[in-house]
């Protein structure tokens, strides 16, 4: 709109009264001013709905010379985007001294226990296996005979 030249508004009745030969009687009345003129009412034509969007284009806006915000605003991201460093890396760097001390005590204690438990578990499992097999055999035979 800024680059377009606007025609001066001339009343239609003034043109018709002074220059009658412009409008013969067998033509319908049409205004002498262009239809897209913003100063002319639209009695005979439908007003155009939207030739251009009414939103200003950012290039045309006059911007101030100074930077208006005084405080730099950082965007607040949702919790899913916040990166939290994994604790495993921190534990690996901090635990080697603790792990060497801690592994000395459990190594001695479990080493003694599994040997005893393994022997006992093996004997117990073999006894239970042998015992359970005859009992299982005995119970079905007894229940079948009774």
UniProtKB/Swiss-Prot annotation:
This is Kappa-casein. Glycans are attached at residues 97, 107, 112, 118, 125, 142. Pfam families: Casein_kappa. The modification Phosphoserine is found at residues 125, 143. The keyword Secreted applies. Keywords: Glycoprotein, Milk protein, Phosphoprotein, Secreted. Its main location: secreted. GO terms for biological process: lactation; protein stabilization. Signal peptide: none annotated. InterPro entries: Casein_kappa. Kappa-casein stabilizes micelle formation, preventing casein precipitation in milk. Belongs to the kappa-casein family. GO terms for cellular component: extracellular space. The modification Phosphothreonine is found at residue 121. It is found in: Secreted. Mammary gland specific. Secreted in milk.
């Amino acid at each position: 709109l800024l680059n377009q030249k606007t025609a001066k508004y001339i009343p239609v009745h003034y043109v018709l009264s002074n220059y009658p030969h412009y409008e013969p009687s067998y033509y319908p009345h049409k205004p002498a001013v262009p239809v897209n003129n913003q100063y002319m009412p639209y009695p005979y034509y439908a007003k155009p709905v939207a030739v251009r969007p009414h939103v200003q284009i950012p290039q045309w806006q006059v911007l101030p010379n100074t930077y208006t915000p005084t405080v730099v605003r950082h965007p607040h991201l949702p919790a899913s985007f916040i990166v939290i460093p994994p604790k495993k890396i921190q534990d690996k760097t901090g635990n080697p001294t603790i792990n060497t001390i801690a592994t000395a005590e459990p190594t001695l204690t479990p080493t003694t226990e599994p040997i005893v438990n393994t022997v006992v578990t093996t004997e117990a499992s073999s006894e239970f296996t042998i015992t359970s097999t005859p009992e299982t055999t005995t119970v079905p035979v007894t229940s079948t005979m009774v």
